[in-house]
């Protein structure tokens, strides 16, 4: 994938993503659909779709820029991060049977993916899946939009307002707050360079997520988030092995 920045003098006008991969072209379609969906739901501070097309063997996706000259990348979760995600969730949340949600589909996918893992690892993941299912199966849940890659490098803060971009991995019916956990974990790994699980857990216990939601809820959404990440990497590894 190649990303071309389009600008006029010092003003960034937008970005055009280009790829000769059909898989990446599919991700362009997903991001385009998700951006248009969010706009219909009343979400601003996100890129606008300019065009999405295929020509010969290339896929093109052009979108406006949310970055301004004074915008800053923030590596901590601020009130603006909380407010953006809360607004996005409230405007997209739907009440549905758990089994009809994107998150339930994720768990079904994960149960298939773990069959190739060592027995001990597979059993640990299956136990977590069963805990989530026990709580939600057969019940109505209220799930909303999940960005999928909510990180410091996909967000920008300017004049007290948070803008967000790169929605290609988004899902529409997921539990609330998982994006916050992703932001926390990605910052620990790639900014703080912290890989020790014990230290990450200690930091999580001191985070605004733990403080605002309480320990029980913070641990619950961490488990829900880890199921998403494990499935992502297992499914990606399987696809690569088949190529």
What are these language model-derived features?
Residues 2-30:
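ATP-binding glycine-rich loop module of kinase domains
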Residues 2-6, 134-177:
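Active-site acidic catalytic loop and adjacent metal/ATP-binding pocket
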Residues 15-21, 64, 166-168:
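Active-site ExK catalytic segment of metal-dependent nucleases
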Residues 22-25, 68-75, 96, 171-173, ...:
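Short, polar/flexible loop-turn hinges at active-site or ligand-entry regions and domain interfaces
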Residues 31-46, 66-110, 125-140, 144-153:
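Conserved kinase catalytic-core helix
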Residues 48-58:
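Short beta-strand micro-motifs within the conserved protein kinase catalytic domain, predominantly
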Residues 57-68:
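Conserved short submotifs of the Hanks-type protein kinase catalytic core
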Residues 178-213, 226-241:
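Active-site activation/catalytic loop segments of kinase-like enzymes and analogous catalytic loops
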């Amino acid at each position: 994938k190649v990303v071309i920045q389009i600008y006029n003098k010092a003003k960034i006008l937008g970005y055009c993503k280009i790829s000769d991969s059909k898989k990446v072209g599919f991700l362009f379609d997903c991001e385009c659909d998700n951006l248009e969906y969010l706009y219909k739901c009343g979400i601003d501070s996100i890129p606008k779709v300019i065009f999405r097309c295929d020509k010969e063997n290339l896929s093109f996706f052009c979108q406006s820029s949310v970055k301004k000259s004074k915008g800053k990348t923030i590596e901590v979760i601020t009130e603006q991060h909380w407010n953006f995600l809360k607004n996005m969730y409230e405007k997209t949340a739907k009440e549905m049977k758990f089994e009809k949600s994107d998150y339930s589909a994720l768990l079904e996918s994960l149960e298939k993916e773990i069959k190739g893992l060592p027995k001990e690892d597979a059993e640990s993941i299956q136990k977590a899946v069963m805990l989530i299912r026990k709580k939600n199966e057969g019940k109505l849940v209220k799930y909303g939009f999940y960005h999928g890659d909510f990180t410091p490098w996909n967000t920008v803060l300017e004049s007290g307002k948070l803008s967000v971009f790169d929605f290609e991995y988004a899902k529409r019916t997921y539990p609330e707050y998982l994006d916050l956990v992703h932001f926390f974990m990605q910052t620990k790994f790639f900014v703080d360079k912290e890989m020790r699980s014990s230290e990450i857990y200690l930091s999580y216990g001191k985070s605004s997520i733990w403080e605002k939601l309480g320990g029980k809820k913070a641990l619950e959404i961490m488990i829900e988030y880890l199921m998403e990440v494990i499935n992502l990497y297992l499914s990606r590894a399987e696809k690569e092995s088949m190529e």
